[in-house]
Amino acid sequence: MAKIRIHEIAKELGYDSKEIIEKANELGLGIKTASNAVEPDIAVAIYEYIQTREIPEAFKKNIKTPTAKKPKKENAKDQEKLNESEKKEPKKEESKEQEKQEIIDTHKPQSLASATLAKRRGLVIVKKKKDEEEIQVKKEEIKNSNDISINNEERLSLKTMFSNADESLKKKKKEKKSFVASKKESTEKMNFLDEHDFGDISLDDEDEVVLPDFSVKEQEKPQNINKKQPNFIRQAVGNSAGFGLEGGIQRRSRKKPPKKIEKKEVEEVSSVSISKEIRVYEFADKIGKSTSEVISKLFMLGMMTTKNDFLDEDAIEILAAEFGIEINIINEADEFDYVKDYEEETDEKDLVTRAPVITIMGHVDHGKTSLLDYIRKSRVASGEAGGITQHVGAYMVEKNGRKITFIDTPGHEAFTAMRARGASITDIVIIVVAADDGVKPQTKEAINHAKAAGVPIIIAINKMDKEAANPDMVKTQLAEMEIMPVEWGGSYEFVGVSAKTGMGIEDLLEIVLLQADILELKANPKSFAKASIIESSVQKGRGAVATIIVQNGTLAVGSTVVAGEAYGKVRAMSDDQGKALKEIKPGECGVIVGLSEVADAGEILIAVKTDKEAREYANKRHEYNRQKELSKSTKVSIDELGAKIKEGNLKALPVILKADVQGSLEALKASLEKLRNDEIKVNIIYSGVGGITQSDIELASASENSIVLGFNIRPTGEVKERAKDKGVEIKTYNVIYNLLDDVKALLGGMMSPIISEEQLGQAEIRQVINVPKIGQIAGCMVTEGVINRGAKIRLIRDGVVVYEGNVSSLKRFKDDAKEVAKGYECGVGIEGCDDMRVGDYIESYKEVEEQASL
């Protein structure tokens, strides 16, 4: 068995290598570094000494008490005894032993011997494996010892020897004996220096064992030996015998023994609870299977995954069935569901009636904002670009001493998410339908949103002051959607109104309050506040701003709040008119300042006790959303792989999108992502709320052919200059129609042009003339249109195209002609065609390119 290195012993025992070196040196082994190697039985001796603090028997027998007064004379006696022992050995080995003895004599100067005596005490043993004996240099005599010899036939692994040694050590601990040596004991270390007459001495064949003085607990390190030992090793390896000399020093093998990997026994798992978002390797660890097993199962099921990919619920359930394990899927979002915690803690005492929240919905340009303007006695619609609402607004009105909160939503098709959000946080929905226009697509969508939210619906038929108003048509169309008016035996209130004259407005508000009384809307103003964010944005000098409607509790200035990934303290609040407020009560709306970032529109805002609690909720939510986003990006099946490869070949228009509010940004992103076909698409590199910054310009410049789109915002002078220097185009809009139309035009320019054919004329071949060195010339009669020189033609025979090419020559009699019109004869030469026949037709045409549009 190969020798064992010190660092392997240290690793096996769980000790540091330095500690093992110290213990080995206490046994006189002369170990210098962790890479030094010892014989297996020496390793066992070190192990026993470390575990029991008892000197092994093999070392006790060799220890004697020499008196080192006359080292030179003793060396002479040693040589005499060595010579006597050599006489008994065969003649072949006599020369080698003499050379070894000469080395011992010549390389032991007085200075080194005295330094060794001062620094280190002990005996030196030189072992020779070849003769299976040890030559021991002592003060008085040399004895042969085979106590520490190696039995080559019984070589065990390091771990086996140590495990066997543990059993013997338990017995030895009971029979501990103290060993005390004389302080006068000393060791003279032989110094092998730079000589060429080493013979066949090998570093692998000899080991040095120093038996120290154990009475000295802390011995000084031999400085002289430490200095010379590295030199000795380097010289010994380098001094290989040259040409004509005997064998040199053998180089020690550098190969490390192969590491043995222990196989861990995996316990069988019958049931396990895992989260929805889990990676492949995490799932494998949970069920006690190897990652490769899980990946191979998924591959057989048609999913190409790596160990870092996320698994969806379907894949988890299928894998559970395959492995025969019961899986309980848990939702990690429950840990930071602050809304659930709030509802559990809500006390139903002290409930009072709150203001109703009304959402006005309907098709674009049906008069929703104008109706609200008349109610509020304001002109919001005139302030909107293009006269269409592109933001969600929340307003407060008072009727008969009672407050009503109105939410105005956009009617444009791009703002579907806004309408859905408005329906989900409202108490009553008013659907506005123009009496002269009837039910439109967004009207149907608004009704579906309201039905999905399960809230009462009131129909307001607007523009009743117009001559073309037809309320019966509106009622009929809505009846087809199962919205039956009360007068027709249904359960829905229909009110005819005019936002221009104010007709029917009072009746509408009366019905709203009556419906609110039926709903019995209650809230506890004394509890922690709970609100819904209907819009959010970034304002210069104020930071993140959110428009909210409080549903329960009272939100005051200084309250600590959390909304999704955003949190903070409410620094200031104001109403829809900009008037500062100190608190917002249930059912009321307002604008708050103080969130750490722009909160997502539609997020629930909760007031909490401490800032630490809010931060923890927000951070956990952020990490969860990040993991969820990563899981979406890594899930792919074999069927989807082809689609992804195809998508990679699409031309893309890189866009950086900035908007004034979160709701508009969502609507724009959704609309732009729909602008695509099999050839082109819009690639939104970055989107955000707020003005266009220099970092946006830098990002756009890093992407080839990218543009910056701004909605309801304007870039500053510095940003414009930066964009000009970088060659980045900035386009700003205040009407969503214009933005979408321009992007469509840009995408159309990126598409391959549409190539169409325009027929020019047709000629009948009546004679074929073979011209030497030129080829065939067709004598033709033009039957339709004109034949142009250089035009593209098709040669048609019996209705089948037999050749396509260009007109190489066109003659009228003997003169060249640019074109020949209908009814005239001409000679036509077709480039590369020598198979023209009488009766064939020549069809002339040109290709026209048209710009594609999306």
Swiss-Prot record:
Region listing for Disordered, in residue ranges: 61-115, 167-186
UniProt keyword annotation of Protein biosynthesis present: yes
Residue ranges, annotated region (G3): 408-411
UniProt keyword Protein biosynthesis, yes or no: yes
Region (G4): 462-465
Residue ranges of the region described as G1: 362-369
UniProt biased composition (Basic residues): 61-72
Residues covered by region (G5): 498-500
Binding site for GTP: 362-369, 408-412, 462-465
The protein's name in its UniProt record: Translation initiation factor IF-2
Gene: infB
